[in-house]
Amino acid sequence: MINTLLEKPEYKIVKTRLGTWRSFGYVDGTSFHEFKSDATWMGLPLIHYTYGRSPETGRRVCAKGVIAIGRLACGIIAIGHASIGIVAVGQLAIGLLFGLGQLSTGIAAVAQMALGVYFGLGQFTTGYIAIGQFAYGKYVLAQFGFGEFVLSMTQRDREAIDFFKTFPVIKDFFH
């Protein structure tokens, strides 16, 4: 839905005390919505939310803000299908500190495929502490684990058992 006439689209603009909403409805019933807060921090809007395809370009708009929410999101806290931020939540979540999603990265990552530096929790996971079905790390708790100290179906390192017993949630599983 690209703007073939190269005309400026007629947005419905609503100003609230927190920011500005821009909306555009297409003839086929789809729509585009965007909210940007008036408050900013280091040049970024405090909240930026996007939904749908831009009537100007026909493409999705990347939400960029301190808190960014949209199909594509980039911010300190980013929430979207593909998100990049210090804290990222989404199907593809590239987080610096924390990632939560189907495929995520971060110092701590929780996902189906979690690539954590310090902590990873997921089906396929890495991290200094790795907990998952298939896991790789220094301290590993997994069905199939690889690493220095592993507690798995086939391996029971004493160091791994003692380490994981220090976590109250996990120690109850040991008899």
Question: Residue ranges of each PLM-predicted region?
Answer:
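Repetitive, compositionally biased segments used for assembly/scaffolding
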Residues: I2-H175
